[in-house]
Amino acid sequence: MANIAAYKKGWERTLRREKALQEKRRAEALKIAEGLRDILVQEFKVSRVILFGSVLKKHGFDMDSDIDIAVEGLAKKSYFKAVARLMMQSQFPVDLKPMEDVRESVRKRIAKGVALYEERASS
């Protein structure tokens, strides 16, 4: 039985380390997402930036996760330039979704996200 107890303790330690690493990666991704927001707003003049997906889930951001960002107001001709620019600034893959082009199923996932930026209407 001693071998099983030692194995269990070792496995629990490994799981705690993995969970801590995942949370650290998630915190880094959230910080990077703020910088990506700034690029999208300042360089590409988008009117709205929404963070969604696994990065918002406390235990959902794993080693294979990306940063999911939806935007409104991105010129179609600027899409690939924006993706390239974001990828250069991020150690994580970035999945950029123009709201004007997404399917309803994706829209529902985006609706559960967090707005990082919304252009104020001028009065």
Q: Each PLM stretch: what is its role?
A:
Residues M1-K45, K57-M63, G73-S123:
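Catalytic core of pol beta-like nucleotidyltransferases
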Residues L51-S54:
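Glycine-rich beta-strand-to-loop/alpha-helix junction loops that act as flexible
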